[in-house]
Amino acid sequence: LFKSWFVDFDPVRAKQEGRAPEGMDEATAALFPDSFDESELGLVPKGWGVVRLDSFVELAYGKALKAENRKAGPVPVYGSGGITGWHDHAFIEQASIVVGRKGTVGSLYWESRPFFPIDTVFYVKSRKPLTYCHCLLKTLGLDTMNTDAAVPGLNRENVYRLLVTEPPERILAAFDSVVSVLRSSMDQNERQAETLATLRDTLLPRLISGQLRLPEAEVP
């Protein structure tokens, strides 16, 4: 959906050709223009702006948390490679996007729970829907923006200078209303997978060692 609306501009092209945009109702289709303007990024839908990424996105620094200082708890701890452990309290309480800063440069992780991003990552603060920002960041090639040969690193000032289109708020709201439902379903599936993985990691060693035995099947 993101690629169709914000990269290929399919609804705009359809209206320009006199066709009804596919996969949307009339009210949503009416939000899109039927022509393009020239811009620094090439053709963009008429009335859409072109802005620097930092006009609506902030990459905030995570906080140092050594492994020996972590206390067992339900809060995921994020490094640039993803979840590196768990802690008993969060640094960030609301949903956000984790961006790899050192190590795995430009890695992206969505997290809807309270979490703890450590100092090898950024976390996103945004003035636009987080669902939109997550999809947008995936298209910007952050993983190719390494600025340090010795220790791979992402310079946020280089990210901030990137130019992106700025769709109207009503279109972003329409996009978010669709994608947030899908995102919620994905979050639930991920939580279930984590629960099953925890059960596996807890029970399998006990089964292998003989500490836990399955009931023998009854033979009639």
Describe the role of every protein-language-model region.
Residues 1-4, 8-12, 18-19:
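Extended, domain-scale alpha-helical bundle/helix-rich regions
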Residues 1-4, 26-79, 169-215:
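Non-catalytic DNA-recognition/assembly elements of restriction-modification systems
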Residues 9, 50, 130, 156, ...:
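Alpha-helix initiation and N-capping motif
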Residues 14-32:
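Charged, glycine/proline-rich intrinsically disordered loops and linkers
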Residues 60, 165-167, 220:
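Charge-rich amphipathic alpha-helical interaction elements
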Residues 79-162:
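A short beta-sheet element
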Residues 110-111, 165-171:
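A glycine-rich, aromatic-flanked flexible loop/lid motif
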Residues 146, 215-216:
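Short, hydrophobic secondary-structure boundary micro-motifs
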